Amino acid sequence: MALTKAEIAADLSVKIGLSKREAKEFVESFFEEIKATLENGEAVKISGFGGFELKDKSERPGRNPKTGEDIPIAARRVVTFRAGQKLKELVEKNMPDTEV
């Protein structure tokens, strides 16, 4: 299951005492600010959580899986996320023991 923006807004409404409308607007504004910063070519770093960075990928050769035809994959810019150390430690600490 994935956490949605609506669920984040509902949790904020309860935990902070915002109205549902205010919480929804806050969450939307938060993500809009992240998007705008990335659109401007800047990285986003959230202390204790991680960071979003832009990486430029150069053109590379690819292959059409249906026909086997060689096709170039165009150069592009992608968004990457790197979890911060605190988040990594928290996730690792709460990972259930599994045997391989």
From Swiss-Prot:
Gene Ontology MF term list: DNA binding; structural constituent of chromatin
Single GO biological process annotation from the record: positive regulation of metabolic process
A Pfam family this chain is assigned to: Bac_DNA_binding
Cellular component annotations (GO), alphabetically ordered: cytosol
SUPFAM superfamilies: IHF-like DNA-binding proteins
Keyword field: DNA recombination, DNA-binding, Transcription, Transcription regulation, Translation regulation
Superkingdom assignment: Bacteria
Quaternary structure, from the entry: Heterodimer of an alpha and a beta chain.
HAMAP family associated with the record: IHF_alpha
Family, as annotated: Belongs to the bacterial histone-like protein family.
Main function: This protein is one of the two subunits of integration host factor, a specific DNA-binding protein that functions in genetic recombination as well as in transcriptional and translational control.
Protein name per the record: Integration host factor subunit alpha
Lineage, broadest ranks: Bacteria, Pseudomonadati, Pseudomonadota, Gammaproteobacteria, Alteromonadales
Gene: ihfA
